[in-house]
C-alpha cells in the first residue's frame, strides 16, 4: 500500500512538471528573453519600432523617424524634437549597440520612444528629461515586458573603446578631480575655444593641453592616404605614356605634317623629303610660274625620318608651297588653261584664242571680252527682239574655269529651234482680208512670212467642187457655203 502511494506521488510530480512546461511554452516570450539572441540576433530596427508603437504607445508615433547613426559614440541614443508640430527623430548609435546584446538595443529603443511620446503628445512637463512623466511610462513598460529600462545606460567600456585621442593639461587642473586634466575624444579634435568650458579653464587653470595618446599607426595612415591620393594620378599618366609608346610629355597637335587618325607617331622635328626624283630643274626654274597654278590640295607622299632612321610607312601631308616646289611640281602636274580646247589653246599656262598670233591680245588674263552674236527675232510675238548684244566671259590665268561646250553650242540650238505658230492669228488675218474684198495674193504674203512652217493640215490646198478654185483645206467649208448660197461677192479664190 505504501509502495503504491509512493509511485502515485512520483507520477503526479512528473505530470505537474510537464504541465508547467506546456503552460510556459504557450506564454509569449518576453522582449528581453535570452532566446531572442539565437532566434533574432540582429533585428530590423523599423519593424521593432512599429511593433512597439502599436503595443505600448497606442500608435501615436507614426510620424516619428528612427534611424541608425554611425558617428555617435558618446551616447547610445538621442531623440530630437523641433518645436510644436515639428519633426521628431530618434537616432541610435550603431558603433555602441553593435557591440552589445539584443536586450540593450530593445531597452534603448524603448527609452527613446518614451521621450518621443512625451514630445508628440505635448506632455513634456518635466523640467528635466527624466522626470515623473518619463518614469511613469518607464515603469509601466517594464512591468508589461519584464525589461529593465533605465534613465542612463551603462555602456562605459564601449564609449572608452572609441575615445582613443587623449589630451592632458600641464596646468594645475591635472591634480583636480574628477578628470585630472584629461580630455578623451573619439575624433582628433584638440581642446580649443570652440568648447563651452574653454573660457572657465583659461580663468581657473590657464594650462596647455598636450596630446598624450592616439590610435596605433594613426600618423602613418594619414600619410598613406596622402600618398594613395597622389598615386592614381601618376599611374594614369604612366598608362597614357605606355599607350602612346613614349615616355615624354604629350606634344599638342600643331596642324602641320600629320595625318589625323593615324596610330603611328611622327616627330615634329623630322625631315620631310619628297619621294619624286628631280633630275634637272634649271630650265624650268627660269620660267614664270604663278603661285595660283600650284595645286595645294594634291597629296604629296613624304617620308618621316628621325635620328637618321627613315620609317617605311609613308605619310600624306600638304607642305607649304615654295618657289622651288612650284617649279618642280609644275613639270609633273601640267595645267589645263580652259575646258573648251577647240576655241582656245594653252600657251605657257594661259588661255589664248585659236587662230591668233599674238597671245596677249586675246588672252583671258588680260581681261579680253568675247561677243556673242545676236539671235534671230522671236516669231512668237511677231516683233524683232534681239538677244543681249554681248556676253562677257572672263577667265583668270592658271585656273580651269572657262566657257563650257554647252554654252558655246547653245546658240546654234536656239537658231535651229522651230518657233511656235499661232494658227488662229494667221487664219483671222485671211478671213478679214477676204471679207473686206482685198487681194488674197497680197494678203497671203504676210501670212506666209508669219507662218513659214505651219502644220500639214494648214498648208494643204484642195479644189472647190463648185467653182473648181484652189482653197485652203481649213477654209473649204466657208468657201462652199458662199458658193452654194450664190453670194453676191464675185471674188474668186486665188492660189495661196
UniProtKB/Swiss-Prot annotation:
Record flagged with keyword Transmembrane helix: no
Family statement: Belongs to the Spartan family.
Cross-link Glycyl lysine isopeptide (Lys-Gly) (interchain with G-Cter in ubiquitin) mapped to chain: 342
SprT-like domain mapped to chain residues: 45-212
Protein name in the entry: DNA-dependent metalloprotease SPRTN
Motif (PIP-box): 326-333
Species lineage: Eukaryota, Metazoa, Chordata, Craniata, Vertebrata
Residues marked Cleavage (site): 227-228
Cellular component aspect of the GO annotation: chromatin; nuclear speck; nucleus
Organism name: Rattus norvegicus
Amino acid at each position: 500500500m505504501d509502495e503504491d502511494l509512493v509511485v502515485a506521488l512520483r507520477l503526479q510530480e512528473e505530470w505537474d512538471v510537464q504541465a508547467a512546461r506546456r503552460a510556459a511554452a504557450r506564454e509569449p516570450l518576453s522582449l528581453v528573453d535570452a532566446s531572442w539572441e539565437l532566434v533574432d540576433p540582429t533585428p530590423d530596427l523599423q519593424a521593432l519600432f512599429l511593433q512597439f508603437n502599436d503595443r505600448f504607445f497606442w500608435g501615436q508615433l507614426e510620424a516619428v523617424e528612427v534611424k541608425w547613426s554611425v558617428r555617435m559614440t558618446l551616447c547610445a541614443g538621442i531623440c530630437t524634437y523641433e518645436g510644436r508640430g515639428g519633426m521628431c527623430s530618434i537616432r541610435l548609435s550603431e558603433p555602441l549597440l553593435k557591440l552589445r546584446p539584443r536586450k540593450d538595443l530593445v531597452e534603448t529603443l524603448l527609452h527613446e520612444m518614451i521621450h518621443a511620446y512625451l514630445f508628440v503628445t505635448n506632455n513634456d512637463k518635466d523640467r528635466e528629461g527624466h522626470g515623473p512623466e518619463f518614469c511613469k511610462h518607464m515603469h509601466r513598460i517594464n512591468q508589461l515586458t519584464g525589461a529593465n529600462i533605465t534613465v542612463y545606460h551603462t555602456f562605459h567600456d564601449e564609449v572608452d573603446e572609441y575615445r582613443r585621442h587623449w589630451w592632458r593639461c600641464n596646468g594645475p587642473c591635472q591634480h583636480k578631480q574628477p578628470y585630472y586634466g584629461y580630455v578623451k575624444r573619439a575624433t582628433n579634435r584638440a581642446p580649443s575655444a570652440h568648447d563651452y568650458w574653454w573660457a572657465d579653464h583659461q580663468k581657473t587653470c590657464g594650462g596647455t593641453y598636450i596630446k598624450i595618446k592616439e590610435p596605433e599607426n594613426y600618423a602613418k595612415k594619414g600619410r598613406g592616404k596622402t600618398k594613395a591620393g597622389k598615386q592614381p594620378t601618376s599611374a594614369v599618366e604612366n598608362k597614357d605614356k605606355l599607350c602612346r609608346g613614349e615616355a615624354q610629355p604629350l606634344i599638342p597637335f600643331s596642324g602641320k605634317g600629320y595625318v589625323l587618325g593615324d596610330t603611328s607617331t611622327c616627330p615634329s622635328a623630322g625631315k620631310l623629303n619628297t619621294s619624286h626624283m628631280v633630275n634637272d630643274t634649271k630650265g624650268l626654274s627660269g620660267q614664270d610660274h604663278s603661285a595660283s597654278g600650284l595645286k595645294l590640295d594634291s597629296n604629296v607622299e613624304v617620308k618621316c625620318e628621325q635620328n637618321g632612321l627613315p620609317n617605311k610607312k609613308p605619310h600624306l601631308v600638304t607642305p607649304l608651297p615654295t618657289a622651288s616646289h612650284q617649279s618642280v611640281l609644275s613639270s609633273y602636274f601640267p595645267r589645263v588653261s580652259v575646258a573648251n580646247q577647240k576655241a582656245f589653246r594653252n600657251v605657257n599656262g594661259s588661255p589664248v584664242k585659236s587662230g591668233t598670233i599674238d597671245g596677249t591680245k586675246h588672252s583671258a588674263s588680260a581681261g579680253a571680252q568675247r561677243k556673242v552674236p545676236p539671235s534671230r527675232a522671236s516669231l512668237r510675238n511677231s516683233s524683232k527682239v534681239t538677244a543681249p548684244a554681248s556676253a562677257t566671259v572672263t577667265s583668270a590665268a592658271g585656273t580651269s574655269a572657262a566657257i563650257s561646250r554647252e554654252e558655246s553650242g547653245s546658240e546654234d540650238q536656239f537658231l535651229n529651234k522651230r518657233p511656235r505658230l499661232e494658227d488662229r492669228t494667221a487664219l483671222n488675218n485671211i478671213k478679214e482680208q477676204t471679207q473686206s474684198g482685198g487681194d488674197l495674193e497680197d494678203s497671203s504674203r504676210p501670212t506666209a512670212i508669219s507662218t513659214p512652217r505651219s502644220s500639214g493640215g494648214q498648208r494643204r490646198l484642195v479644189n472647190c467642187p463648185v467653182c473648181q478654185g484652189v482653197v485652203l483645206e481649213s477654209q473649204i467649208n466657208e468657201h462652199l457655203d458662199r458658193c452654194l448660197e450664190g453670194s453676191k461677192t464675185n471674188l474668186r479664190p486665188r492660189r495661196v
